[in-house]
């Protein structure tokens, strides 16, 4: 993760994505959607984190607001970093994984909202990335079934 850490520090500054704390050298790089759930190492799923937030979050499901923030990062910057360090962004995989994880959650499941903060899962207003058509055109087709 050293190339990611260096590139993210240069592009986004040496600050924890979650709490904004200034980061020392060698800070953790965190998987927003936990590696244990999705196994995605793409740049779209990675952020700089302080040791406190990284340890507190561990493998917890992040709050919707955190996923929103990570997906709202400048994609051109992530693509530029990807080319420079030869590391995939995997944004489509991150969106699909987040959609699948959150759609399968029961109401009020606890999610990690920051250091020692739990936010109950509530999708009263579904984020755009949870919609099946997010980021792509949808082809409409019709199928006729004839019973014989």
PLM segments and residue spans:
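Extended charged
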Residues: 61-148
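Generic hydrophobic alpha-helical scaffold/packing signal
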Residues: 5, 47, 51-54
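Sparse, context-dependent recognition of short Cys/His-centered cofactor- or disulfide-binding micro-motifs
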Residues: 1, 17, 31, 86-87
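Short, charged surface segments at domain edges that flank catalytic/cofactor-binding sites
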Residues: 1-15, 40
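Histidine-centered nuclease catalytic patch
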Residues: 18-48, 57-73
């Amino acid at each position: 993760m050293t190339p990611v850490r260096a590139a993210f520090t240069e592009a986004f500054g040496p600050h924890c994505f979650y709490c904004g704390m200034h980061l020392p050298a060698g800070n953790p790089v965190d998987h927003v959607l936990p590696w244990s759930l999705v196994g995605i190492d793409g740049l779209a799923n990675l952020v700089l984190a302080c040791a406190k937030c990284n340890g507190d979050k561990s493998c917890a499901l992040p709050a919707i607001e955190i996923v929103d923030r990570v997906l709202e990062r400048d994609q051109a910057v992530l693509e530029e970093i990807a080319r420079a360090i030869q590391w995939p962004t995997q944004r489509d995989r991150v969106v699909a994984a987040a959609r699948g994880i959150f759609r399968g959650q029961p109401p009020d499941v606890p999610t990690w909202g920051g250091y020692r903060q739990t936010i109950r899962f509530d999708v009263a207003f579904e984020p755009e990335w949870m919609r099946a058509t997010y980021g792509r055109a949808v082809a409409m087709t019709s199928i006729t079934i004839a019973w014989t």
